Design a protein with these regions (language model features):
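N-terminal Rossmann-like NAD(P)+-binding subdomain of aldehyde/semialdehyde dehydrogenases
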Residues: 2-127, 156, 296
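Conserved C-terminal structural/oligomerization subdomain of aldehyde/semialdehyde dehydrogenase
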Residues: 27, 50, 339-495
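Flexible, glycine/charged-enriched surface loops at secondary-structure junctions
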Residues: 51-59, 76-78, 193-197, 270-273, ...
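Short beta-alpha connecting loops at secondary-structure transitions
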Residues: 167-168, 244-248, 278, 446-452
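Structural signal for hydrophobic packing residues in well-ordered secondary-structure cores
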Residues: 43-46, 50-53, 61-72, 81, ...
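Short, flexible turn/loop "capping" segments at secondary-structure junctions
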Residues: 38-40, 239-241, 270-274, 361-368, ...
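ALDH superfamily catalytic-core signature
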Residues: 21, 29, 151, 227-358, ...
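Rossmann-like NAD(P) dinucleotide-binding subdomain of oxidoreductase/dehydrogenase enzymes
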Residues: 116-257
């Protein structure tokens, strides 16, 4: 075999680079044309839909809701989701598909939730608000909720007379395809254009990125990479990311009730939700009592050796989160970790002692599993400090909870902890995204405000899918005097 000359190597390298560039350009051109076709069909459907009155729009929203609330549909979607993603628990996904969709429908059918034409008139200020669509919505959805999240976003988008194109996760694509079939069946019944709701023809990163560029509005729920892609797409967006819920149990809490609620939150759907409790910070006077109550609820407290085994099962070699234990049944986690104690094998969830915050203790972050990190705080001051540090590490702006009977403590944590949701004596996984026993909007996408680098600091709702025209009419002129506005300042500091 002859030795290649430098010229030969350079030429072949240049040709290879050129071929790669051509292939990339071809893929981008294909993505551009594929998305352009989807968007064109969406706009044509919107051309019909924008003439619907509020009653017909609400009927379309009901159609989408029924596509997933219908029990046999909810069950088949849940079965397929667990089968294809390997994440979560079938029974809980059925409940999530139905409960979240029913709650969202309740919000959207509220007589005050107007989204067509004139939605508000303020006679005193002479302002009339007229609701209009934002346009074609690109919705990137996660594998953890491959049916409930796209259905939720579709209901909200259609409430505003928009069209929506869904970019599912690779593992959730088949579930999304089935959901789309169910939705189209219901849209046909009410005579609505089917192209109001579409999905990418196949899962492809370039298609998803091109969709975010060509759409009028982007909403992303999922991984940090997808959220960043949405935020940097150049398109107006509502993109939300990681949670890492911390629940504080103070010395005044109803212990048994708090333990039941934390267990329910921790174990639901095997921890797929960003709203499940990841850590609990317990005041020292009730620490032992609370841990025992959590054990009675099915929790298993790992000793130091078992903690090491569990950490290796979640983060092999201290690296990337292992898919083997992600959103899996506790029996699977026990098997992977090599936990031999029969009580561990039968546990509903696992507890580990919190030994630090940040990279020094990976258990202080979001785990997406039935593992709860338990911290002891000497007093409420220390509990707040710990909570703040944990959320600063992961989950800034998202949410936390407090189990208490002290209104003074409620006010303190509300003032001192920078989150957009603070739930008092609630099941975090149900309450964060709206519940029938609280006043938050039902959603599966929760903004964390500027703390989280998000554009929204509330639960995603239909209002985020509206543009508002504000018609301003003249009103009687009232010009304040300088004395009225500056008098208090002058009296204190002079002119």
């Amino acid at each position: 075999m002859g030795v290649k000359s430098i010229g030969q190597v350079t030429a072949e390298g240049t040709n290879a680079a050129g071929d790669e560039i051509e292939a990339t350009n071809a893929r981008e051109a294909d993505a551009d044309s594929t998305i352009a076709e989807l968007v064109s069909r969406a706009r044509a459907a919107m051309g019909i839909f924008e003439h619907y009155d509020q009653e017909r729009v609400n009927e379309v929203v009901q159609a989408v809701a029924w596509a997933i609330i219908k029990r046999e549909n909810a069950e088949e979607l849940a079965r397929l989701a667990v089968q294809d993603t390997g994440l979560g628990k079938y029974e809980d996904k059925v409940d999530k598909n139905r409960r979240k969709s029913l709650g969202t429908l309740q919000d959207l059918l509220d007589p005050m939730a107007r989204s067509v034409g004139i939605i508000e008139v303020d006679e005193e200020k002479g302002i009339t608000k007229i609701a209009k669509p934002v346009g074609v919505v690109a919705a990137v959805t996660p594998s953890t909720n491959p049916a409930a999240t796209p259905a939720n976003k579709t209901m909200m988008a259609l409430k505003g007379r928009n069209a929506i194109i869904i970019a599912p996760s690779p593992k959730g694509a088949s579930t999304c395809k089935l959901l789309l079939r169910y939705i189209h069946e219901e849209l046909s019944k009410v005579g609505a254009p089917l192209d109001l709701v579409q999905a990418l023809p196949h899962v492809d990163k370039e298609l998803a990125h091109e969709l975010m560029k060509q759409a009028d509005f982007v909403t992303v729920t999922g991984s940090g990479n997808n959220v960043r892609a949405g935020q940097t797409s150049g398109t107006p967006n509502a993109c939300v990311g990681a949670g890492n819920v911390v629940s504080v149990v103070d010395s005044t809490a109803e212990i048994e009730e708090a333990a039941r609620k934390i267990r329910t939150s921790k174990t639901f759907d095997y921890g797929t939700s960003c709203s499940n409790d990841n850590s609990v910070v317990i005041e020292a006077p009730v620490y032992g009592e609370m841990v025992e109550a959590l054990k009675r609820e099915g929790g298993y407290f790992c000793d130091d050796e078992e903690r090491v085994l569990l950490e290796e099962a979640l983060w092999p070699g201290g690296g990337k989160r292992s898919s083997e234990t992600l959103c899996k049944a506790p029996s699977v986690i026990a098997e992977v970790a090599g936990l031999e104690n029969p009580e561990a094998r039968e546990a509903s969830f696992f507890m580990v002692e919190g030994k630090g915050v940040g990279e020094e203790d990976l258990f202080s972050g979001e785990k997406l599993s039935v593992v709860l990190t338990v911290y002891k705080a000497a007093n409420f001051d220390e509990a707040l400090d710990l909570t703040g540090r944990i959320l600063h590490y992961v989950g800034r702006g998202h949410s936390c909870g407090l189990h208490t009977t002290s209104e003074a403590n409620v006010e303190r944590i509300g003032q001192e902890i920078d989150v957009c949701r603070l739930l008092i004596n609630q099941i975090q996984v149900f309450g964060n995204g709206g519940s029938f026993d609280n006043g938050l909007d039902f959603t599966l996408s929760m903004g964390g405000g500027s703390w989280a680098g998000n554009n929204i600091d509330e639960n995603l709702s239909y209002r985020h899918f509206l543009n508002i025209t504000r018609v301003s009419r003249t009103i009687p002129e009232v010009v304040p005097t300088e004395d009225e506005l500056l008098g208090s300042y002058w009296s204190r500091y002079g002119r």
